């Protein structure tokens, strides 16, 4: 059967409806909470002269917060399903990169090595000395740089569908070429058309789910915000410094990720001394598309050294 990627007929709606409805229902709850989920506060913070949109879910006192670093071009709403799948007592901090979502575009480009000060300033303004940090895709590079530059601020590190930067095993050239523009974030039909090829995993079977995840709530700013984020990682690599990563690290990688081949996770696992590797069935977007499955692995890792009440010993 051939599926028209620019529209969804009755068969496709029936097949994808339950998954989309479940995920998108949670996406629309950003900031409101639910019967089991604490409400989140959305605010604009000025950090180092940059206006940054931030969402904070308050958790139980004494529990370390989880700071989420997004991938390229996506706003903080994309991972609402993952946040909702976590223990509601866990504080969670999300933010939009400059020029993405609700954060205004910067006037001039920036580089990844300058961004640890942004994360440190964010934690300072929210009153946290230390955080668990999760980075996915591009955000995994930011999480690595933060842990290398400010190891005192990172308690535990989770790297999802990511790589060590320039010195990585790349995906297929056609896939990387499609990543050079923000079109998939602006054109729903195109997003469905390329979802399987780009993201693999569940997106191959249900490109409509991937399309709706990308377009449910994302508020993409000027195109230069995407391009600034894209070029910020040029020339950057963590590879020779990975043995110096101090925090305990969980590496999550999909066995069908066209953007970041799983071999990169195996290389990182070999180089990061205190690391655990978990290879899951799926692709690049499973943290949002199938959050319950991966949330359990993340929570078990983050809670490994906490006391019974969830606080640090």
Where are the language model's segments positioned?
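Alpha/beta-hydrolase fold catalytic core
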Residues: 1-66, 89-90, 303-313
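Conserved HGGG/HGGXW glycine-rich cap/lid loop of the alpha/beta-hydrolase fold
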Residues: 50-102
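Active-site loop/oxyanion-hole signature of alpha/beta-hydrolase fold enzymes
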Residues: 94-134
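Flexible "cap/lid" loop of the alpha/beta hydrolase fold
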Residues: 144, 148, 155-184
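Conserved alpha/beta-hydrolase catalytic His-Asp/Glu region
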Residues: 168, 188-241
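Short beta-strand/loop motif that positions the catalytic acidic residue
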Residues: 245, 251-253, 257
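Conserved alpha/beta-hydrolase "acid-adjacent" motif
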Residues: 258-264
């Amino acid at each position: 059967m051939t599926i028209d990627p620019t529209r969804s007929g009755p068969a496709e709606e029936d097949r994808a409806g339950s998954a989309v409805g479940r995920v998108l229902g949670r996406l629309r709850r950003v900031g409101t909470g639910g019967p089991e989920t604490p409400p989140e506060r959305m605010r604009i913070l000025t950090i180092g002269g940059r206006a940054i949109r931030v969402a904070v879910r308050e958790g139980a006192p004494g529990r370390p917060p989880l700071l989420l670093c997004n991938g390229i071009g996506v706003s903080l709403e994309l991972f609402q399903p993952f946040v909702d799948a976590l223990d509601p007592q866990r504080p969670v901090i999300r933010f939009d990169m400059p020029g993405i979502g609700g954060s205004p575009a910067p006037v001039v480009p920036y580089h990844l090595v300058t961004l640890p000060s942004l994360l440190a300033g964010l934690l300072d303004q929210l009153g946290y000395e230390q955080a668990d940090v999760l980075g996915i895709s591009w955000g995994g590079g930011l999480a690595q740089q933060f842990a290398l530059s400010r190891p005192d601020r990172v308690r535990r590190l989770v790297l999802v569908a990511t790589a060590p930067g320039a010195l990585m095993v790349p995906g297929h050239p056609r896939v990387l070429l499609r990543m050079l523009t923000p079109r998939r974030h602006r054109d729903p039909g195109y997003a469905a058309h390329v979802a399987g090829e780009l993201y693999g995993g569940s997106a191959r079977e249900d490109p409509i789910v991937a399309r709706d995840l990308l377009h449910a709530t994302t508020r993409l700013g000027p195109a230069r915000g995407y391009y600034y984020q894209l070029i910020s990682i040029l020339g950057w690599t963590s590879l020779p410094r990975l043995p110096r990563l101090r925090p305990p690290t969980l590496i999550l990688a999909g066995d069908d990720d066209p953007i970041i081949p799983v071999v990169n996770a195996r290389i990182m696992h070999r180089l990061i001394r205190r690391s655990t590797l978990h290879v899951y069935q799926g692709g690049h977007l499973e943290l949002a598309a199938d959050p319950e499955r991966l949330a359990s692995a993340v929570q078990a890792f983050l809670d490994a050294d906490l006391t019974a009440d969830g606080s640090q010993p």
